[in-house]
Amino acid sequence: MKLLNSLVLLAALCAITANGKIVEDTPDPSTVYNLFQLSSSDGGCDPAGTHSPDANVNVSVDKCRNVCNKNIKISKGTSTNQFTFQTYNDNSCSQATSDQALSFTCSDNVKKQLGTSIYSVICSTGSDSTNPTSTPSTTPSATPTVTPSTTPTVTPTVTPSTTPTVAPTVPPTTPPSTTTGSGSTVVASFGLIVSILLASLAL
């Protein structure tokens, strides 16, 4: 632990200058000064104003770009913060023109004239731009497909109707006849009664 604290203290002392300020490490130029803003007034751009006579475009290091109808590429040099500007005959930047390659160092926000090419460069940071002379392809914006929300169908609960139970109609039971004897017996008895009555009247 003591050794670690000593190393931290030693590093802090080494980073302090005589005036008491912290010395910042020099940024890596390949990551800080990696973009360049170019402009041209050598007639490569449309002088009638259809396009701006100054084509401002960010160009990444080692990327072939067409700026004002000229193919250019800025390459990283051999020493720190050194770059090379070169024009090419082809759009893949493999055939250099007869123009001499220009070597320059990059200082942030300092504009540099690049020889007879009348290109200028401002070292800056940002995103690689598209070619200013090319018409960007118009990609139609895709209409998002709206998926309708599927509301679940609620099946209604059917309550069965309670039909009252109808009691079956029971026909009244006919009580058995209490008359005894057959029909002939009744007739005979009636005849006997009539005979007795007639006999009584005859007396």
Swiss-Prot record:
Highest taxon listed in the record's lineage: Eukaryota
Subcellular location as annotated: Cell membrane
Topology class, membrane: Lipid-anchor; GPI-anchor
Stretches the record annotates as Disordered: 127-183
Glycosylation sites: 58
Primary localization class, coarse: membrane
Coiled coil (residue ranges): none
Family to which this protein belongs: Belongs to the ponticulin family.
Functional description taken from the UniProt entry: Binds F-actin and nucleates actin assembly.
Record protein name field: Ponticulin-like protein H
Organism of derivation: Dictyostelium discoideum
